[in-house]
Amino acid sequence: MDARDIIKRPVVTEESTSILDDKKYTFEVDTRATKTQVKYAVEEIFDVKVAKVNVMNYKGKLKRMGRYAGYTNKRRKAIVTVTADSKEIQFFEV
């Protein structure tokens, strides 16, 4: 997989913006991506050194449309911690 295929989008929530001070950045990633692939993708795209990657999997939620039921897509979220000497990712500047 290409680095741009692994990292889908940043996750911007109140919780994710509060941990930016600790140099932790939150991304939605491909469901098949491993921690190592996420690390290399972030290092390649943003030119930073990654110290740690934490990953969470979310199941799809049940949604109904009248009598028809289905599920939303499952998601995978990664919290990437960069090293102290790395520059800040400008993507998240507020």
UniProtKB/Swiss-Prot annotation:
Domain of life according to the entry: Bacteria
Pfam families to which the protein is assigned, alphabetical: Ribosomal_L23
InterPro entries: Nucleotide-bd_a/b_plait_sf (IPR012677), Ribosomal_uL23-like (IPR013025), Ribosomal_uL23/eL15/eS24_sf (IPR012678)
One BP annotation, GO: translation
UniProt keyword Nucleotide-binding, yes or no: no
GO cellular component, one term: cytosolic large ribosomal subunit
Keyword field: Ribonucleoprotein, Ribosomal protein, RNA-binding, rRNA-binding
GO molecular function, one term: structural constituent of ribosome
General function of this protein: One of the early assembly proteins it binds 23S rRNA. One of the proteins that surrounds the polypeptide exit tunnel on the outside of the ribosome. Forms the main docking site for trigger factor binding to the ribosome.
Record text on subunit structure and interactions: Part of the 50S ribosomal subunit. Contacts protein L29, and trigger factor when it is bound to the ribosome.
Recorded family membership: Belongs to the universal ribosomal protein uL23 family.
Name this polypeptide is given: Large ribosomal subunit protein uL23
Species this chain originates from: Listeria monocytogenes serovar 1/2a (strain ATCC BAA-679 / EGD-e)
